[in-house]
Curated annotation (Swiss-Prot):
The gene is atpF1. Pfam families: ATP-synt_B (PF00430). It is a single-pass membrane protein. This is ATP synthase subunit b 1. CDD domains: ATP-synt_Fo_b. GO terms for molecular function: proton-transporting ATP synthase activity, rotational mechanism. Belongs to the ATPase B chain family. PANTHER family: ATP SYNTHASE SUBUNIT B (PTHR33445:SF1), ATP SYNTHASE SUBUNIT B', CHLOROPLASTIC (PTHR33445). One of its GO terms (cellular component) is proton-transporting ATP synthase complex. F-type ATPases have 2 components, F(1) - the catalytic core - and F(0) - the membrane proton channel. F(1) has five subunits: alpha(3), beta(3), gamma(1), delta(1), epsilon(1). F(0) has three main subunits: a(1), b(2) and c(10-14). The alpha and beta chains form an alternating ring which encloses part of the gamma chain. F(1) is attached to F(0) by a central stalk formed by the gamma and epsilon chains, while a peripheral stalk is formed by the delta and b chains. The chain crosses the membrane at residues 6-26. F(1)F(0) ATP synthase produces ATP from ADP in the presence of a proton or sodium gradient. F-type ATPases consist of two structural domains, F(1) containing the extramembraneous catalytic core and F(0) containing the membrane proton channel, linked together by a central stalk and a peripheral stalk. During catalysis, ATP synthesis in the catalytic domain of F(1) is coupled via a rotary mechanism of the central stalk subunits to proton translocation. It is found in: Cell inner membrane.
Length: 161
């Protein structure tokens, strides 16, 4: 049994482990593994912190987006109300403008009609005066004719004007 290769391998393994223990290989290996574990733990902590920050940023973005959408909807609704109000005002102003223009046109027409009637009356009076003066001057002569002519012309003018 002492000459079996398994025995010598086992003895060499034990001696190697003792030498490693004496040299501190196990301690340095454990230290390296501890450092690596600490580095991995720090990376995991950073990843967790970054994930939480990303979740906060996402929640903030969603809240701001919802707020912006509500504000946009309010702005659109206010713009529609304002547009309707402006359209109503414009319609009322246009109707008022048309009514005033119509009234102005009607008064100008009435004034033109009155002027035309006055012009026609004046022309008729002139024609009547001319006709009366022609008839009277042919039928009556002298001072009586002149007095009668002046009196009739003034009466005709008073009645026609």
């Amino acid at each position: 049994m002492f000459f079996d290769p398994e025995t010598w391998v086992a003895i060499a393994f034990v001696i190697l482990m003792v030498v490693f223990g004496y040299l501190g290989v196990f301690k340095s290996a454990m230290t390296a593994l501890d450092h690596r574990a600490a580095r991995i733990k720090a990376e995991l902590d950073d990843a967790t912190r970054l994930k939480q920050e990303a979740a906060k940023v996402l929640a903030d973005y969603k809240a701001r987006s919802a707020t912006a959408e509500r504000e946009a909807a309010d702005i659109i609704a206010n713009a529609k109300v304002e547009a309707e109000r402006i359209a109503t005002e414009a319609k009322a102003k246009m109707e008022d403008f048309v009514a005033r223009r119509t009234k102005t046109a009607e008064s100008k027409i009435a004034l033109a009609e009155a002027q035309a009637v006055a012009d026609v009356r004046a022309a008729a009076a002139e024609a009547a005066v001319q006709a009366a003066s022609t008839i009277l001057s042919q039928s009556v002569k002298g001072q009586v004719a002149d007095d009668l002519l002046a009196k009739s012309i003034s009466e005709v003018r008073q009645k026609l004007n």
